[in-house]
Amino acid sequence: ETKQISVVAINRNTMTQINVYDTEGNFDHTGVGQICLAHGYGDGMEESCEREKKAVSNLLYSLPISGYAAINMGAVPMINDAVGGVTVPRMTYQDGKIEYGKDQTLMGEDAYRFVHYRGNDFDAATYRLEKQKVYLKALMTKMLASVKANPASIVNLYQSVSPYMVTDVDVSEVTY
């Protein structure tokens, strides 16, 4: 209706109730931990995503999560280049503040470095998360324009990304 894209980003260091498993993968207990650990208690694939989905739902007061898509960072250059590059502002982080500069169009490995680099400052995860939100919003805008111009492009992109992705959302749900 508003034709706007909103991104809800959850910092990997957010503390919430997560299920804890033993070394054999058996449920041990529920405790408070970093939300990113929920994924680590799984197999790195569907099991990890289901456990992360549960932790996110717990964080959001049992809000049902209808689906997930975990995409390996190695897919970023391919996705980025498939839409002709993504334009984002230059971002610098200093003294706890993000400063925005001139726009830059990221291609290939530059896109990967933009969304992946975290640094080692105390609040580096927050800075990276902000960069990822900016990037994702710009990417989604480009993808929507691409789909409007050629509706089949979303199917092609989905198929290209599939080897890098674990999801419970099938291509028909993406296209309709």
Regions found by a protein language model. Name each.
Residues 1-176:
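Non-catalytic, solvent-exposed segments at the cell envelope interface
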